[in-house]
Amino acid sequence: MLSPEELRHYQRHVSLPEFGSEGQARLKAGSVLVVGAGGLGCPALQYLTAAGVGRIGICDFDVVEESNLQRQVLFGYSQIDRPKVEAAAERLTDLNPHVSLEPHPERFSPENAERLLSDYDVVLDGSDNFPTRYLVNDACVMFGKPLCFGSIFKFEGQVSVFNYQDGPTYRCLFPKSPNPQDVPNCAEIGVIGVL
């Protein structure tokens, strides 16, 4: 059920006959874990929050750096050296106070995967390295969670949704992880901020 304040806040959604208050209530009842609060996670977090997804987890172990600011649009100079999950949650709460934001200031790992995934309906992987992508995929398959995946490389981007029940997974698409020495990172090759 939506409060009068939420009905006002989401009025443009609710006005759509195909969506209405029922659609908004479904978003409010939903939950998403976003792994990575970087160049992919930041815009995803903004839109999930603005749309009114009821509960959003933010998993990242990193701090805001000046080099992040040209593409990680949640952050500003005043947040440099702060944990990304804290800075993101603060900004997102200001964007939409009707959403519950849950910071997880830790690296996604085999030891915490079940605990992190268990309470969320969907997982969005915005991580920036192959070991984490494979781990998130495998955990989603193991614990029965749909996975939204995105990645960027210089001027290119990829996005996909993997459903553990009746479709291929990230590991099906890319069976073998590339050698870490063969894969440059954003600091080495650059990345455009508008993807």
Task: Identify the function of each model-found stretch.
Residues M1-L195:
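Adenine nucleotide-associated cytosolic modules
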